[in-house]
Amino acid sequence: PLGLLVGHQSLEAWGWRGAFLVYGVLELGLALPLLAWLFREPAPGAGVAAGTAVAETALSGSSAPQAWRSASFWLVLGNQVLAVFVMSGIMTHGVPMLVERGLSRGEAGTALSALWVGMMLSQPLMGWLLDRVATPRVALPFALAAVLGMAWFLVGDTPSSLWLAVFLVGLGGGGESGTTKYLLMRYFGLRSFGVIYGSIQPFTFALSISLGTYLLGWLYDRAEGYGTAEWVLLAAFSLAACSLFAFRPYPQKLP
């Protein structure tokens, strides 16, 4: 939300070049010092016992080829591709979509900030549920919240109703798209986790993000409005929610 506010004010004051410059200065002057301060390598010899324990348990699980031949892998991938596709599209086109709904640019920026509020709340809430509910369908309430939010977006016409719609999209989509690592670990273990997770990244980040941005723009140009694009986003969220019913229970014992 703060980034959106800073970006909007910078855009109004100095144009898009000035806004990018402000973001660059903040990245260099704020983010990098925080990284240097908060993230440090442990002292030599620290955590040897813990590292040994991890090494012993890391051998359990599927190999990468075994995971790729599993239906569970492709279900996780498909679910995440759909969720990230919608979220990236809204992040990129959210302000003009809201302006088309009748909001001013300032109101649209404020409403879109609800997306990040929902995403921030979704992560600890989803983590809390994952620790207590041993089923991949634990993400279903979040998926349904995202569907409800997108449907509400289609009919909302006031700043408050659109803020709530965007909040539900952020809460649901953020929770659903934040389960990738956990689901892969539960289905396939830690034996080849890096390779398995890395093989999903090109689809969820490269394909979904670029496709979400491009396709919404293409649909806008063809339809001269975002109406068709919004229905596509609703369909994608709905398909992602339905895919959760096909997820198998976690294996009782990993290979």
Whereabouts are the PLM-identified features?
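Small-residue-rich segments within alpha-helical transmembrane domains of MFS-like 12-TM solute carriers
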Residues: 1, 84, 88, 170-178, ...
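Interfacial helix-cap and linker-helix signal at transmembrane-aqueous boundaries
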Residues: 4-14, 98-99, 129-130, 215-224
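Symmetry-related core transmembrane helices of the 12-TM Major Facilitator Superfamily/SLC fold
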Residues: 18-37, 229-246
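Residue-level signature of the transmembrane alpha-helical cores
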Residues: 23-26, 79, 139-149, 165, ...
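Flexible cytoplasmic inter-helical loops of multi-pass small-molecule transporters
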Residues: 39-62, 254-255
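Extracytoplasmic gate region of multi-pass secondary transporters
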Residues: 65-124, 212
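C-terminal transmembrane helical hairpin of 12-TM major facilitator-type secondary transporters
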Residues: 112-183
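A late C-terminal transmembrane helix in Major Facilitator Superfamily
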Residues: 187-223
